Amino acid sequence: MSALPEEKSSQINASSHSINPASTNTASIQGRFISFEGTEGVGKTTAIEQLCNHLQAKGIDYLRTREPGGSPFAEQLRAILLDPDTTINDDTELLLMFAARCDHLQQVILPALQRGTWVICDRFTDSTVAYQGFGRAHGDSAVRAKIESLIRQFVVQLPELTLWLDLPVLEGMARANKRSAADRFEQQATEFFTRVHQGFSILASEQPERIQRIDASGSAEQVSQRIWQTVQEKFALS
């Protein structure tokens, strides 16, 4: 996975569970913002690659990026957050996630959208709700309220479409275990990822217009076709 955004050679203001993005001038935004979500091992990397291939075939400029990370400073925070040897409390983890996100938005995402470039992001705010709000905090309402407050204060643009790749937790973990050494999140127990999955499911039920569940079972090509059909319908692509 590349460390920094990858741009290839072309409207948005999505709502989120009673969350309005932080106030900013987004009138000049012309691009589309799509995020991918899911627990470990659901196939996001492959799915993103194949969506980008579809966009390129359509002549649509796109920028592929990720969270945590996506900008030089955010990538430094990513290294800390994913390092298995990092020992930090939950509040520190949450605030580092938002520090990385603020820089990523200002340095990478917003400039791309203002150029008319489509932004394809591997994880965004929904991962924070699912991982920190449900995985770490067991769905505690106070923690979720804290996360939503941070979104309102610091996230100036939400995705117009979020593709939640849904796969049974144990199946995803089995896939993930075939990869290289596990990072700090991948080392968590099954119960953690069960809560994360529950978080994504709740988010999808609360925001059905923005978050689309994609069945991530079957072949990569089958999943790619489900995603492309959803994107075509959302953005009226022929």
Model-identified regions with their sequence ranges:
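NTP-dependent small-molecule kinase module
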Residues: S2-S15, N20, Q50-C52, L170-S238
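A glycine- and Lys/Arg-enriched "phosphate-lid" helix/loop adjacent to the NTP-binding pocket
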Residues: D126-Q198
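Hydrophobic positions on the alpha1 helix immediately C-terminal to the Walker A/P-loop
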Residues: A47
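Walker A (P-loop) phosphate-binding loop of P-loop NTPases
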Residues: G41
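Conserved lysine of the Walker
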Residues: K44
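Hydrophobic anchor at the beta1->P-loop junction of P-loop NTPases
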Residues: F36
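Pre-Walker A (Motif I) flank of P-loop NTPase domains
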Residues: I29-F33
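ATP-dependent small-molecule kinase phosphotransfer cores
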Residues: K58-V155
